[in-house]
């Protein structure tokens, strides 16, 4: 449903519940980009000095998965000569944020406006640019710091206050921009 409608998605579940595996499969089931979308993708990647190698790149949309330690410039774009960051490189594709609460709160808050508007404006001394960033946000997180809240096979070691602080790292306004919230139960294999 999320892929068909291009809805932003967050998956909450313990380690090993398949959250990351599902997120990595999403670009492969998205419809191929139109020619116009593909040209947009090429322009952005070219502006970042990246190439789209291989014939299969035409069939799939971009999938970006930045680490939670990424800099603001790497995430949003910028630099001395402004250029695209991860959110623009995910344009017409997927931006996967694994372990969402591990990202700095300020790093998550700056996603709100681009998610709403579909573009990001970057102002630097060398100039101002506006880059497109219409992407499907896919996020994953554990239900608590230890990861095992609600897992029938593991005991959660977290105090209620720890769980509350952990979940408070993600603001209500950001969660409001995520259309589908899914609980991913532990898998028994």
Which positions does each model-derived feature cover?
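Phosphate-binding P-loop
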Residues: 1-6, 14-15, 87-90
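Walker A/P-loop
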Residues: 9-52
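Conserved RecA-like P-loop NTPase ATPase core
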Residues: 38, 75, 90, 98, ...
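Conserved AAA+ ATPase core "coupling" helix
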Residues: 40-42, 148-189
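AAA+/SF3 P-loop NTPase mechanochemical coupling elements
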Residues: 63-66, 83-92, 122-142, 153-154, ...
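Conserved AAA+/SF3 P-loop NTPase catalytic/coupling segment centered on the Walker-B
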Residues: 67-68, 83-116, 148-151, 171-175, ...
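Substrate-gripping "pore-loop 1 plus following alpha2 helix"
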Residues: 81, 109-131, 150-168
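A short beta-strand-to-loop transition that corresponds to the Sensor-1 phosphate-sensing loop
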Residues: 98-100, 125-126, 139-144, 161-162, ...
């Amino acid at each position: 449903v999320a892929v068909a409608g291009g809805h932003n998605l967050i998956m909450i579940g313990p380690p090993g519940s398949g959250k990351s595996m599902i997120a990595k499969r999403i670009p492969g089931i998205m419809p191929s980009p139109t020619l116009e979308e593909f040209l947009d993708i090429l322009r952005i990647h070219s502006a970042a000095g990246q190439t789209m190698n291989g014939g299969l790149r035409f069939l799939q949309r971009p999938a970006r998965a930045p680490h939670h330690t990424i800099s603001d410039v790497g995430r949003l774009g910028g630099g001395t000569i402004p250029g695209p960051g991860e959110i623009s490189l995910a344009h017409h594709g997927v931006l996967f944020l694994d372990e969402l609460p591990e990202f700095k709160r300020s790093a998550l808050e700056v996603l709100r406006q681009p998610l709403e508007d579909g573009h990001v404006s970057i102002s630097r001394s060398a100039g101002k640019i506006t880059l497109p960033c219409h992407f499907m946000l896919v996020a994953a997180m554990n239900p608590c710091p230890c990861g095992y809240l609600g897992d029938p096979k593991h005991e959660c070691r977290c105090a209620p206050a720890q769980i509350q602080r952990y979940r408070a790292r993600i603001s209500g306004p950001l969660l409001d921009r995520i259309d589908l919230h899914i609980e991913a139960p532990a898998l028994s294999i």
